[in-house]
Amino acid sequence: HIGRMDQQDTSVIYTAQAADVRADNGGIVGAFVLKGTPRAWGLSKKGFCASIDGVVTVGVAENSPLFEEATEKEGYFFRQYPLVDNRQLVENALKGKSIRRGICDRMGEIFMVETGTPESLHDFAQALVDLGVDQAIYLVGSSAYGWAIDQEGTRHEFGDNNYYTGRRRMPKNTSYIVWRRK
């Protein structure tokens, strides 16, 4: 999804900001496919997430055939910082501590993780390795807004819902990973 999320959409069970947006021109950083349409090209980060025919794949590669497959099958694809590759921590240049989020694959189970406290990217990735995660990539953390609906139907919001108000304008290419009810 690109653009502001409809907070009243009851079909959404999870959403979080996905790809980074360039500060200089508002473009999406790295390769990005939305419902089969390429919206950005390039390799800025080696981590990727693809959703094609209802199958989510998280991985790390310079070149992935899933970008092309997403364009051919009306799928989705985006790039982000890699955190874990084949159960091995991937070092990244990002420094400092922040709330961290990631999308992970552990033995074929896809799930999202968020830290409860500000952490370094290294410590976050190490925790994922310690949890037995096979593959993981970063999702935009810090104040980026999103929500999840648990099995009882309770909504859990994270980030700052009012971040893009006043003088701060949401970049037009702000993208979200969205999971919906079947």
Predicted regions and their residues:
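Gly/Ser/Thr/Pro-rich low-complexity, intrinsically disordered segments
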Residues: 1-182
